Amino acid sequence: MKCPFCAFADSKVVDSRPDKGGSTIRRRRECESCGKRFTTHERVEEILPLVIKKDGRREPFDRMKLVAGIQKACEKRPVSVETIERLVDRLEIQMQESGEKEIPSKSLGEWVMAELHSIDQVAYVRFASVYRSFKDITEFMSELQDLLKK
């Protein structure tokens, strides 16, 4: 692992342990050149399906892109980063278990909205407003009315 301080290519692992959820390994490393210590988080690289975009393009699933979108919807809301990470972890597990090679972005968006609905309704409406691309206030109000009925 390349040292973030001096860019030396080799380091040794000083300590290694699973994180709280068990999905990643936290490692403390020491640079063999400058001696400084740094932390890395490692996770198994999983093979996830391609995402079929609205325009028909296909691209690899990008966890960070999804996390960023959800974080934007949850901005200034009482939703922790850990809650968002667990939400995306559940989605990745669901995608792997489906065995599908491709998944429409619409399916991902609907799943995220269902999860956000139970976590924070304001974040749900924010995510829905971007995901569903409301054309006018009427569509937005319709979504709010549906939310109030539930």
From Swiss-Prot:
Residues 49-139 form the ATP-cone domain. Keywords: ATP-binding, DNA-binding, Metal-binding, Nucleotide-binding, Repressor, Transcription, Transcription regulation, Zinc, Zinc-finger. A zinc finger (unnamed) spans 3-34. Pfam families: ATP-cone (PF03477), Zn_ribbon_NrdR (PF22811). Binds 1 zinc ion. Its cofactor is Zn(2+). It comes from the Bacteria. Signal peptide: none annotated. InterPro entries: ATP-cone_dom, NrdR-like_N, RNR_NrdR-like. The keyword Nucleotide-binding applies. The keyword Transcription applies. GO terms for molecular function: ATP binding; DNA binding; zinc ion binding. GO terms for biological process: negative regulation of DNA-templated transcription. Negatively regulates transcription of bacterial ribonucleotide reductase nrd genes and operons by binding to NrdR-boxes. NCBIfam families: transcriptional regulator NrdR. Belongs to the NrdR family. This is Transcriptional repressor NrdR. It comes from Geotalea uraniireducens (strain Rf4) (Geobacter uraniireducens). The lineage of its organism: Bacteria, Pseudomonadati, Thermodesulfobacteriota, Desulfuromonadia, Geobacterales.
